[in-house]
């Protein structure tokens, strides 16, 4: 996951949480709903990127182990 992807997903999560809170305080159900959606989207994007990072780490570990066995 690139740094910009991490920043964007965290930003979506934070902005969404703020919108959700403001929508709740102002009784603006559309803003609250949009905020909840944006926050959830940011969380999902973060989890997807975390899985990609772990898969990439696993790939490197398997490759290192295979290289060690060849050696």
Curated annotation (Swiss-Prot):
Gene3D superfamilies: YjbJ (1.10.1470.10). SUPFAM superfamilies: Hypothetical protein YjbJ (SSF69047). InterPro entries: CsbD, YjbJ_sf. Residues 20-46 are annotated as: Disordered. Belongs to the UPF0337 (CsbD) family. This is UPF0337 protein PPA1427.
């Amino acid at each position: 996951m690139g740094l910009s992807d991490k920043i964007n997903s965290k930003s979506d999560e934070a902005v969404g949480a703020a919108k959700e809170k403001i929508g709740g305080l102002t009784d603006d159900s559309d803003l609250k709903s949009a905020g909840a959606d944006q926050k959830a989207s940011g969380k999902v994007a973060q989890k997807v990127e975390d899985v990609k990072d772990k898969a990439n780490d696993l790939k490197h570990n398997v490759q290192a182990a295979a290289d060690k066995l060849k050696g």
